[in-house]
C-alpha cells in the first residue's frame, strides 16, 4: 500500500522544468493583446499584486491599476484603515469628485480664503442651505479685495458654467475649454451640487489610457479578507471594493469552503467579485467553484519567501498546480490567478500557457517605490524589506493577519502568549525604482513570448503554446553562461 503510493506518485513541474516551443508565427510582439478578464474585472495587463504587507497598499494599487493591472490591498491592518485605503484608490482618478469642499454665500471673503489655503485649492463652489449651486469663488475674485469681511455673495461669480451628472468626459472638456474654466460643477435637475470635474483631473486620467477602471471610470481595486472575517467583508462591500480576495494558505479547508458560500451570499446584488485561494488541486477547484468562487488563486508554497513546502512538506510544483486547476476551471468559465514562483517574465508566459488568466506577483514588485516595505542600504546598495505573510514578523505585526492566514490565529491581544510555527521568512530585495519600469519589462517579455508562440492574445497563448520538458543541463544552457556579466540587464538581475 505505502510502496504503491510512492511508485504511483505523479511527476510535477514548475517553471524552470519547461520551455515553450517556438511556432510558425505572423504575430509581432508589439501587436499582441495582453488584456484579460477576471470574471468581469477587465484588466489590460495580466498582473495582480500580492496581498502582502510589504507589497500592496494604496500606492501600489493606484500605480498598478493605472498601468492596467490590479492591486490587492493586504489585510494586516485594521478594517478602518483597509477601507480608507480602498477609498483612496477609488478617489485617485475620479471623474466626478463627490466630496466637494464648498462655502456659503453668507461666509466672509476671509473665511473663503482660509478654506482655499487650508486645502490648497484655488476655487470653491458656493451653495445655499439646500445645497443648490448659486455661484463660484476663486482666487481671482478675492486677490484684490482688501476688506476681508465682505460676503462671498457680493464677490462671487454668479453665472456658473455647469453640467449634469451624465456628462461625458469629452463633453466636459469641451465645455471647460470653450468657457475658459478649470472647474465644472455637476448639478442635478434641481441645481443641487452633486460634484465637480476639474481640468487637471481629466488631463491626469488621459496620461493612463490603459488604466483598469470600473463602470464609473474609477480605478479598480481588490482587498484581502480572512476566511472567517465577515465584518471586514461587510465594510469592504460598503466601500465599493471591486473584488474581495479570501486570503488563506489552504482554501480547501472545508470550513473555508462553507464560508465561501456565505461570502457569496453577502455579495448578491453587487458587482463585487470573489477571489478565493490558495489551492493546488482539481478537487479544490471543483469544491470552491461549487461554493461560489468567481476567481481561483493557485499556489501552495511556490513563493520566494514561503517555507510551507519544507516546514509542512506540502505543496505542488506551480506549473502542474496551475494546469490541473485550469482543466477544471475552464469547464466552468472560472478564471485563475497563478500566485507565486514567478521570477522572470518568461515565467508569466509559461503560467498563461498552462492555463492561468493572470499572475500574482510579490517579490518582483516588493523592491519598487510604491511597495510599503522599508528602504534600507546594505553594503552600499539599496534594498527594500520583503517578508512572507507566514513569517513571524507578519504573524505578530499589524493585526496578526499572517497567523490567521495559516490557521494560527488567536486574538491579536493574546499574540505574545502564543507560540507560532512560521511558514515564511523575512528579508530584503534589491530596490528597483518605479513599478512602471518593472511592469514594462515583464509585459515586454510576455509579448516577446507570444510572438514566438504565434499568439495574438492570451486565449491564443493558452491554445497554441506547447511545452518541452528540459533536463538540468537544459536549465543551465537556458541562462547566460561562460561569461562574466559586466552590465546588469533590467529584466535579468544578477544573483538570482
Curated annotation (Swiss-Prot):
Catalytic residue list: 306 (thioimidate intermediate), 405 (proton acceptor)
Enzyme class of the recorded protein, top EC level: oxidoreductase
Catalyzed reaction equations: IMP + NAD(+) + H2O = XMP + NADH + H(+)
Domain CBS: 96-152, 156-212
Keyword Metal-binding annotated: yes
Protein known as: Inosine-5'-monophosphate dehydrogenase
Keyword Membrane attached: no
Subunit relationships: Homotetramer.
Pfam families per UniProt: CBS (PF00571), IMPDH (PF00478)
Chain positions recorded as K(+) binding sites: 301, 303, 306, 477-479
Binding site for NAD(+): 247, 299-301
Regulation of activity: Mycophenolic acid (MPA) is a non-competitive inhibitor that prevents formation of the closed enzyme conformation by binding to the same site as the amobile flap. In contrast, mizoribine monophosphate (MZP) is a competitive inhibitor that induces the closed conformation. MPA is a potent inhibitor of mammalian IMPDHs but a poor inhibitor of the bacterial enzymes. MZP is a more potent inhibitor of bacterial IMPDH.
Keywords, alphabetical: CBS domain, GMP biosynthesis, Metal-binding, NAD, Oxidoreductase, Potassium, Purine biosynthesis, Repeat
Species, as recorded: Methanocaldococcus jannaschii (strain ATCC 43067 / DSM 2661 / JAL-1 / JCM 10045 / NBRC 100440) (Methanococcus jannaschii)
Gene (name only): guaB
SUPFAM superfamilies: CBS-domain pair (SSF54631), Inosine monophosphate dehydrogenase (IMPDH) (SSF51412)
Binding site for IMP: 304, 339-341, 362-363, 386-390, 423
GO biological process: GMP biosynthetic process; GTP biosynthetic process
Amino acid at each position: 500500500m505505502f510502496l504503491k503510493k510512492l511508485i504511483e506518485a505523479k511527476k510535477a513541474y514548475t517553471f524552470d522544468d519547461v520551455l515553450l516551443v517556438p511556432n510558425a508565427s505572423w504575430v509581432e510582439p508589439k501587436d499582441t493583446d495582453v488584456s484579460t478578464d477576471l470574471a468581469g474585472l477587465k484588466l489590460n495587463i495580466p498582473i495582480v499584486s500580492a496581498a502582502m504587507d510589504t507589497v500592496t497598499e494604496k500606492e501600489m494599487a493606484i500605480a498598478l491599476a493605472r498601468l492596467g493591472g490590479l492591486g490587492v490591498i493586504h489585510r494586516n491592518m485594521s478594517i478602518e484603515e483597509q477601507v480608507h485605503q480602498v477609498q483612496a484608490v477609488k478617489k485617485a482618478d475620479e471623474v466626478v469628485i463627490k466630496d466637494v469642499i464648498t462655502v456659503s454665500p453668507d461666509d466672509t471673503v476671509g473665511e473663503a480664503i482660509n478654506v482655499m489655503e487650508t486645502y490648497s485649492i484655488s476655487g470653491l463652489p458656493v451653495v445655499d442651505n439646500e445645497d443648490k449651486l448659486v455661484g463660484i469663488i476663486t482666487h481671482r475674485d478675492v486677490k484684490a479685495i482688501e476688506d476681508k469681511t465682505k460676503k462671498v455673495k457680493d464677490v462671487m461669480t454668479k453665472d456658473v458654467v455647469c453640467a449634469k451628472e451624465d456628462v461625458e468626459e469629452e463633453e466636459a472638456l469641451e465645455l471647460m475649454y470653450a468657457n475658459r474654466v478649470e472647474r465644472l460643477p455637476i448639478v442635478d435637475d434641481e441645481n443641487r451640487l452633486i460634484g465637480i470635474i476639474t481640468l487637471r483631473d481629466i488631463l491626469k486620467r488621459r496620461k493612463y489610457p490603459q488604466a483598469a477602471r470600473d463602470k464609473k471610470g474609477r480605478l479598480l481595486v481588490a482587498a484581502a479578507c480572512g476566511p472567517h472575517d465577515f465584518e471586514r467583508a461587510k465594510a469592504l462591500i460598503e466601500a465599493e471594493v471591486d473584488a474581495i480576495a479570501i486570503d488563506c494558505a489552504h482554501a480547501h479547508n472545508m470550513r473555508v469552503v462553507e464560508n465561501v458560500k456565505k461570502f457569496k451570499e453577502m455579495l448578491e446584488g453587487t458587482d463585487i467579485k470573489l477571489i478565493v485561494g490558495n489551492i493546488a488541486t482539481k478537487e479544490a477547484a471543483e469544491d470552491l467553484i461549487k461554493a461560489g468562487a468567481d476567481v481561483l488563486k493557485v499556489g501552495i508554497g511556490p513563493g520566494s519567501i514561503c517555507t510551507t513546502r519544507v516546514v509542512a512538506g506540502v505543496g505542488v510544483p506551480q506549473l502542474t498546480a496551475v494546469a490541473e486547476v485550469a482543466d477544471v476551471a475552464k469547464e466552468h468559465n472560472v478564471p485563475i490567478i497563478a500566485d507565486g514562483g514567478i521570477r522572470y517574465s518568461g515565467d508569466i508566459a509559461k503560467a498563461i500557457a498552462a492555463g492561468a488568466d493572470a499572475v500574482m506577483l510579490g517579490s518582483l514588485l516588493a523592491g519598487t517605490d510604491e511597495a510599503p516595505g522599508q528602504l534600507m542600504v546594505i553594503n552600499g546598495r539599496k534594498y527594500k524589506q520583503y517578508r512572507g505573510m507566514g513569517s513571524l514578523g507578519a504573524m505578530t505585526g499589524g493585526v496578526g493577519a499572517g497567523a490567521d492566514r495559516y490557521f494560527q490565529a488567536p486574538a491579536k491581544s493574546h499574540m505574545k502568549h502564543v507560540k507560532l510555527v512560521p511558514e515564511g521568512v523575512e528579508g530584503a530585495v534589491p530596490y528597483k525604482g518605479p513599478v512602471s519600469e518593472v511592469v514594462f519589462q515583464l509585459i515586454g517579455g510576455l509579448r516577446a513570448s507570444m510572438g514566438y508562440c504565434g499568439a495574438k492574445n492570451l486565449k491564443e497563448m493558452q491554445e497554441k503554446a506547447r511545452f518541452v520538458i528540459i533536463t538540468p543541463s537544459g536549465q543551465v544552457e537556458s541562462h547566460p553562461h561562460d561569461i562574466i556579466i559586466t552590465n546588469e540587464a533590467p529584466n535579468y538581475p544578477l544573483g538570482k
